[in-house]
């Protein structure tokens, strides 16, 4: 089990970012600095859990449009284009905001609402498994898988 191989860790702080192309982009929380433990966790999840993902469909490939060679390779190999070296951890906060004025207002509102959150560390202590029946349905949580703790790690050593 992937989760049992990790101890809880912290992302030192988060920043608010607008990711993607302007009209199709979205606001998200992203790590303020690179977090190696987060990268190790992502790689373990992608590689060790690949057998459990749904098969890649032709429409999934078409939907991605123009991808770099690395992203296209990731898509065919792992089922998603932004994994491994292309991975960027983010917590999505909004949908796409086409109107530039509204985008600026939403950004200002989020910065104000998140003042205490952006400087605080984010503790990562579990993986949560989600499923989606189809592209038109929301994701639903299936299971929360806690990381090991120091006592468990010492017992295994």
Stretch-by-stretch model annotation:
Residues 1-157:
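Histidine-dependent nucleotide/RNA phosphoesterase domain, centered on the 2H-phosphoesterase fold
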């Amino acid at each position: 089990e992937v989760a049992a191989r990790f101890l809880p860790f912290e992302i030192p702080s988060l920043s608010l970012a607008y990711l993607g192309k302007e009209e199709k982009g979205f606001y998200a929380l992203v790590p303020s600095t690179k977090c190696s433990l987060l990268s190790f966790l992502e790689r373990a999840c992608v590689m060790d859990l690949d057998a459990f993902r749904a098969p890649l469909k032709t429409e999934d490939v078409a939907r991605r449009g123009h991808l770099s060679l690395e992203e296209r390779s990731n898509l065919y190999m792992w089922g998603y284009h932004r994994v491994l070296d292309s991975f960027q951890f983010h917590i999505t906060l909004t949908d796409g905001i086409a109107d530039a004025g509204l985008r600026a207002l939403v950004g200002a509102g989020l910065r104000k609402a998140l003042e205490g959150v952006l400087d605080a560390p984010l503790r990562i202590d579990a993986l949560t498994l989600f499923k989606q029946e189809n592209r038109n349905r929301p994701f639903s949580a299936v299971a929360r898988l806690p990381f090991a703790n120091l006592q468990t790690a010492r017992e295994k050593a």
